[in-house]
Amino acid sequence: MTKPIILTGDRPTGKLHIGHYVGSLKNRVLLQEEDKYDMFVFLADQQALTDHAKDPQTIVESIGNVALDYLAVGLDPNKSTIFIQSQIPELAELSMYYMNLVSLARLERNPTVKTEISQKGFGESIPTGFLVYPIAQAADITAFKANYVPVGTDQKPMIEQTREIVRSFNNAYNCDVLVEPEGIYPENERAGRLPGLDGNAKMSKSLNNGIYLADDADTLRKKVMSMYTDPDHIRVEDPGKIEGNMVFHYLDVFGRPEDAQEIADMKERYQRGGLGDVKTKRYLLEILERELGPIRERRIEFAKDMGEVYNMIQKGSERAREVAGQTLSEVKGAMGLHYFN
């Protein structure tokens, strides 16, 4: 019996951080190990170029780092197909066919695109590739006939746009070639949108407010000890706030069930007064090191042979291209574009 297909991936614009880990990577590994799905995981370098077109080297260099992060967290090339988007030219051809099914006005109404255009400050100079990348995402998803796409809740409009394209294509050509995907969204919204160490809503390289999977133990310690807490909690005996306190936010996200009572007790003591920030940060450091230490060690081991890392990705890309090629052939057949025997 054919397994349901999952497609997921990341833009390779730098090393991945713990926001990526709790928001998607950890769940991908769980889904992989269930062995109920055929999983495709891709490095979306073409999508990253939509706002890094003049700095492609950043993307190229990031491919290796993101691949290391994938392997370190437990994604296994023998269980999941890991590939590079630009190595699958069939995706670009699918995008071209789908563009004829989507109006410019519809693209401009996409809430996710509108938000990202505002955040990136494009003004009137919006790259065409950026505006149409929801169509490229639809090509990525449909090329592998993905049944499920794990994404953050902010990506719901993208999934809906893909579903619209699938319906438009199948209706226009009276076929059922394309599969309508469903989004898989984080159950823990706090994990799905992990804020930065400084309390900023976004953890990012540009803001220098993230913990990266590649960070060594000393770097992790320094970052945790510098985290934003309650600025009015000056003395240990002062009552403190846990709302907006990044240490407690991270404890809620990374704590395991067996940690729940200790975390609850710490919250009560902190709010009452009598618990200092240094102690809460040290406790968080223990919990993070428990989670990230093994990942760090695996990453170091994989990094010793980057040739083998790229070999794994090449094999995955070859398999992905075979699958995408079959879908493209079916799409062209439905459109009547097979001219020769």
From Swiss-Prot:
EC number(s) recorded for this UniProt protein: 6.1.1.2
Keywords: Aminoacyl-tRNA synthetase, ATP-binding, Cytoplasm, Ligase, Nucleotide-binding, Protein biosynthesis
Residue ranges that the Swiss-Prot or TrEMBL entry lists as coiled coil: none
Chief place where the protein resides: cytoplasm
Enzyme class: ligase
Gene3D superfamilies: HUPs (3.40.50.620), Tyrosyl-Transfer RNA Synthetase (1.10.240.10)
Motif ('KMSKS' region): 202-206
Gene Ontology terms, MF aspect: ATP binding; tryptophan-tRNA ligase activity
Renumbered ranges of motif 'HIGH' region: 12-20
Taxonomy, superkingdom: Bacteria
Residues that coordinate or bind ATP: 11-13, 19-20, 152-154, 194, 202-206
Reactions performed catalytically: tRNA(Trp) + L-tryptophan + ATP = L-tryptophyl-tRNA(Trp) + AMP + diphosphate + H(+)
UniProt cross-references to PANTHER family, sorted A to Z: TRYPTOPHAN--TRNA LIGASE, MITOCHONDRIAL
Subunit text: Homodimer.
Name of the protein described by the UniProt record: Tryptophan--tRNA ligase
Species: Streptococcus pneumoniae serotype 4 (strain ATCC BAA-334 / TIGR4)
